[in-house]
Design a protein with these regions (language model features):
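Active-site groove signature of glycoside hydrolases
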Residues: 92-113, 134-147, 246-247
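Helix C-cap/helix->beta junction micro-motif
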Residues: 61-62, 95, 133-134, 163, ...
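A short, acidic, flexible beta-alpha connecting loop/helix-capping segment that sits on the rim
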Residues: 244-256
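Hydrophobic faces of well-ordered beta-strands that scaffold small-molecule active sites
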Residues: 1, 26-28, 66-71, 100-102, ...
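H/E-rich (His + Asp/Glu) clusters that bind or coordinate divalent metals
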Residues: 221, 230-233, 237-239, 243-245
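Acidic/histidine-rich catalytic cores of soluble enzymes
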Residues: 8-9, 15, 25-26, 125-226, ...
Length: 266
């Protein structure tokens, strides 16, 4: 639902706009506690203090389904992530969202890589136990220092052996991280996919940032950037898995353009 982030829309307004454009699914962002912009109706994030059944009512009213929840939290910081993810998994279960998406997050300034992997294993183990009980999947996304390469993302995926853990592949982050060929990477993880972020990267952003950053919050309209979406969709189809393409762009016009472009390829 990042497409309404610059339009001062509340969650319900974002759901209504998604339906108006033609989208079948949304991926809500959730947070702990209360914060001013969401409570005032100027931001789309949902507090997990809300009743998840009420959130589902809003979606049902507009005929919208939930593909997953955006629950990005630093796995390297268990004091933040363990309880947040466990609560998000329970919230997703009641809401009817099959997936919660996350990443390793910015690491603590003082830890070593070895320590970070121990911390991530602890966090993911705690989260996976709850996810297995509730039948929820955890989508690991390439977004930060360790997951920016195919080998790095795989190393995090292998930390915990659980049927609840899969991959939320982000095409834009895979490109910007510069850790390898996007399509070879997608091919290598296609059978682990539980969700997919349809994020395109403008040619200019690619020139300016590729290999210098590990990801970006949102991209340009799908079809306007560097990603070969026809090739991406062909790879996903060979996975024989039902995977939702969750568009990540920053404006309503880009969301409209992305929907129209991708719909022709599906």
């Amino acid at each position: 639902m990042e497409f309404v982030r610059h339009h001062d829309k509340p969650f319900a307004g974002g759901v209504e706009k998604a339906k108006e454009i033609g989208y079948e699914y949304i991926e809500p962002m959730v947070h702990l506690g209360r914060e001013l912009l969401s409570e005032a109706g100027y931001f789309h994030s949902v507090s997990m203090y809300e009743d998840p059944l009420y959130i589902r009512e809003i979606c049902d009213k507009h005929g919208i389904k939930v593909s997953g929840l955006s629950t990005h939290t630093p796995l390297c910081k268990p004091e933040i992530s363990v309880e947040y993810l466990k609560m998000a998994i329970r919230f997703a279960s009641d809401l009817g969202a099959p997936v919660v998406n996350t990443d390793e997050g910015p690491k603590p300034a003082w830890t070593t890589k070895e320590m970070d992997y121990t911390l991530m294993k602890y966090t993911l183990t705690e989260a996976a136990m709850v996810a297995e009980r509730h039948g929820i999947l955890i989508g690991l996304e390439q977004h930060q220092q360790y997951s920016k390469s195919p080998e790095g993302l795989q190393s995090i995926y292998e930390l915990v052996e659980s049927p609840a853990i899969g991959i939320n592949f982000d095409a834009g982050n895979a490109y910007l991280g510069g850790g390898g060929d996007v399509y070879d990477w997608l091919e290598s993880v296609k059978h682990k996919l539980v969700h997919f972020h349809a994020k395109d990267i403008s040619i200019q952003q690619g020139k300016d940032e590729r290999g210098k950053v590990t990801g970006t919050p949102v991209g340009c309209a799908c079809g306007d950037g560097v990603v070969d979406w026809k090739r991406v969709i062909e790879i996903i189809k060979t996975s024989e898995k039902e995977v939702v393409l969750s568009v990540e762009c920053g404006t309503v016009p880009d969301a409209v353009k992305s929907f129209e472009y991708l719909s022709k390829l599906l």
